[in-house]
Amino acid sequence: MLSDREIFYALMLDSKNRLIGVNLVSQGGISSAIVVPMMVFKPAIIANSPAIICTHAHPSGDPAPSREDRDCTARLVQAGAILGIRVLDHIICGDGEFFSFADAGILTDSLP
C-alpha cells in the first residue's frame, strides 16, 4: 500500500553496490516532497558510500516522472558527480508499477 504523501529515500551502497544504509530524506505532501541535495548526500559521505539509489512513491499511483522529478534527478546527478558519489538510479513507485530513470536510459542524460 502506498503512503498518502510523497516520501523520498536514498539507498546507500558500497563499492560492490551492496546496500549499506537507508536514508529517509524527506516526507512531503500528497503531490511533492522537498529534496535538498545536502540531505541526500551527507549520510552517504559519512558512510563512505560511493553510490546511491534514490526512490520515492507517487501517492496518485502513477509512477510516471513529473517535470519536478526530472529536474530533481538532474540536480542530484550533477551534485553527485561533483562529490564523487554516483547516482545509479531514481526509482518512482506507483500502484504495483515503477519507473526507473536508469532503465529508461535518461539518468545519464542529466549529466552536463
Model-derived segments and spans:
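Long amphipathic N-terminal alpha/beta scaffold segment
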Residues: 1-20
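Active-site-proximal loop/helix of nucleotide/amide-processing enzymes and allied scaffolds
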Residues: 12-16, 26-112
